[in-house]
Amino acid sequence: MNWGRPLLTLCVTLGALPAFGQSPDPVLRVCSDPQNLPFSNRAGEGFENRIAQELARDLGKTVEYTWFPQRMGFVRNTLRKKDDATGKFACDVIIGVPAGYELTATTKPYMRSIYALVHAGRKDLDSLDTADDLLKLPPEQLHKLRIGVFAGSPGADWLLRNQLLEQAVNFPRQSGDPAVNPASVIEHEMAAGNIDVAIVWGPIAGYLAREHSSSAAWHVIPFSPDPQIRFDYPIAMGVRFGEKEWKDTLDCWIDSHQEKIQGILREYGVPLLDETAKPL
C-alpha cells in the first residue's frame, strides 16, 4: 500500500501543508548540483534526485531544477536568488545540507552518515574491519601507504592525530572545474595508482563501492564516532529562513517517509547511523 497521500492528508489536517503542499503551483523547484554523484546530476541518477522525485510525487508536483555547482556561492545563486521581475525565487529546497547549516533553515534530519576508509579491493588490506585497524598494520606496511584525503576534512585531522600526515595525498575540497567532484577525484587517483586508500564522506565511499561491485570489489570501512574528531553528521533539507509552513511540510513528509528514504540511501551503499550514532 502507498501510504504517501494518506500521511500527507494527515499533514494537511495538522496544518503543515497550506503554503506549498496545496499550492496551485504544479512544480517543486529544487536547488542542485548538475554533476555531483552520488548526490545529484542532470540525468537524475543521484539519491538526492530520487528523494526529490518521491517528495514531488507525494505533493502532486513535478520536479524542476536550478543547477549550480555545489561550492562557494551555491545558496546565493540558487535558494536565495530572486527574479526582480516576477518576485519568484529560483528554487525552494536544497535536498541535502548539514543539519543546523548556517546559510539556510533546516528541516529535521532525514539521515545520519559517517566518514569511511575506502580501498580498491587490496588483498593486503583485507584484514581491516575497522578504520583503527589501519593503525595496527605492521609499520613497514603502514608507512608505505598513500592515503587520499580532502583538505580540512575529519580525515585530515585523523591523519594528523596519528602522525600520518607525511603519507597524505591532499586534494582541495573544491575544484576549479565544475565537472570534477570528490567521487571522481578518488576514483581517478585510485585507478592511476596515486593513492592506496582514501578517507571520504560515507555516501561517497558507498557509491564508489557500488560502482565497482562488478569488478575488483571496493571495500568501505566506516569510522566509529569519536569524542575528539567528529566523523558523523546528520543531513537535512535546506529552505529559506522564515518559511515555516514549507519547513513544516517537509518535516512532516520526512517523518512519514523514513523507511522509503532509507531504502533509497541503502541502494547507494550509504553507511547509515541512528540518532544515537549506532549503525543501522
Each model region followed by its residue ranges:
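Alpha-to-beta junction loops
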Residues: 61-62, 80-96, 145, 185-186, ...
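Bacterial N-terminal signal peptides
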Residues: 7-18
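Ligand-binding clefts/hinges and TM-proximal coupling segments of bilobed small-molecule sensing domains
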Residues: 62, 150, 154-167, 251-280
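Extracytoplasmic small-molecule ligand-binding "clamshell" domains
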Residues: 23-97, 101, 177-180, 267-271
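Periplasmic-binding protein-like
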Residues: 33-36, 112-116, 124-125, 210-254, ...
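Short amphipathic alpha-helical coupling segments at ligand-binding clamshell hinges
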Residues: 47, 51, 241-264
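Bilobed "Venus flytrap"/periplasmic-binding protein-like clamshell domains
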Residues: 34-37, 44-57, 117-181, 203-204
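Acidic, polar ligand-binding/catalytic clefts
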Residues: 53, 65-141, 221-230
